Amino acid sequence: MAKDYYKILGVDRNATDEEIKKAFRELAKKWHPDLHPENKQEAEEKFKEISEAYEVLSDPQKRRMYDQTGTVDFGAGGQNFNWDNFTHYSDLNDIFNDIFGGNFASDFFSGFGRGQREEQYDLDLYTNLDITLEDAYYGTEKRIKYRRNAMCPDCNGTGAKNGKLITCPTCNGTGQQRIVRGQGFFRMVTVTTCQTCGGRGRIPEEKCPRCNGTGTVVVNEDISVKIPKGATDNLRLRVQGKGQSYNGRTGDLYVVLRVRNDRNVQRINDDLMIDQKINFAQAALGDTIEVNLFREKYSLKIPEGTQPGEVLRIKGAGMPHLNGHGSGDLLVRVNVEVPKRLTQKQKDLIREIFDIKENHRSWFH
């Protein structure tokens, strides 16, 4: 006989989602098994029935199927509900917090066979590498020396002599240990990685003499890392398979670049800026000069009437675009040098050019 989920929760067939949730919360608090030690079995059945009804009526698709056919498909379980079908853990967690305090939902369902995943280890390594702006401009290769746990070459990371493994007697091959606290229906179950086998479920029948059963050996690495043109500060370079090894797996090495500032060159995204001195005549009359950037030389035209602090641009002479084509621009900020000492003839010529009267002689002393 089909169950009447609306009757179980005590709501009308046109009940809103909020009304269904409210009814479930009240009934779940009322029938929690640990609150009924005198008739715990009845409370367990009632609590499960309430949860089943809520699972169906709080899900639009399941509720629509139930309203149309009077039945619900719970997946692998068919029409039979079990705790693996329940998906509203956050709602139960709120209820448990009201009753007991703390975060109990995940531990509560562990008592019904919902185990936790095997503990995962971060096998990746990270290291910083300082480079110059010139290194980033041209691209280069740098050597890095470090130590890591590598897979034992004698046992291929199994930790077993001759590679022979047996089932772990502590966890019976599950890779996990379950610690149960409390009694009765409401049990606190903590699932941890097995300390004997490290979560593998198997242990060496006889330990590898080289690695003493760990599956790894410490090695000193000396590797070359390619720095791409256009490298930026905090850029992460991945060196595959050069991280830590554990349980037959090996992580990666991540090299984090630190691009040092250059006293003569300023980076603005992919544009580079330098300061260039020119004399008064070049600024006034114009000229073509040579500017230097690292190991490169570029020709730059100084227009007539160039002002101090004016920025001139050499297209495509800046920082190469990272992982792309082309480059930024080279920005040349012009600094006009004013001579500190002039001959009398030079002073007279300047006065004549700018029609400066004799009473302004102090300008040139």
UniProtKB/Swiss-Prot annotation:
Chain positions of CXXCXGXG motif repeats: 152-159, 168-175, 194-201, 208-215
Any GO BP: response to heat
Gene: dnaJ
Record's protein name: Chaperone protein DnaJ
PANTHER family reported for this sequence: CHAPERONE PROTEIN DNAJ, DNAJ HOMOLOG 1, MITOCHONDRIAL-RELATED
Domain notes: The J domain is necessary and sufficient to stimulate DnaK ATPase activity. Zinc center 1 plays an important role in the autonomous, DnaK-independent chaperone activity of DnaJ. Zinc center 2 is essential for interaction with DnaK and for DnaJ activity.
Keyword Metal-binding applies: yes
Organism: Thermoplasma acidophilum (strain ATCC 25905 / DSM 1728 / JCM 9062 / NBRC 15155 / AMRC-C165)
Cofactor note: Binds 2 Zn(2+) ions per monomer.
Subunit structure: Homodimer.
Keywords assigned: Chaperone, Cytoplasm, DNA replication, Metal-binding, Repeat, Stress response, Zinc, Zinc-finger
Compartment(s): Cytoplasm
Zinc finger boundaries on the chain: CR-type: 139-220
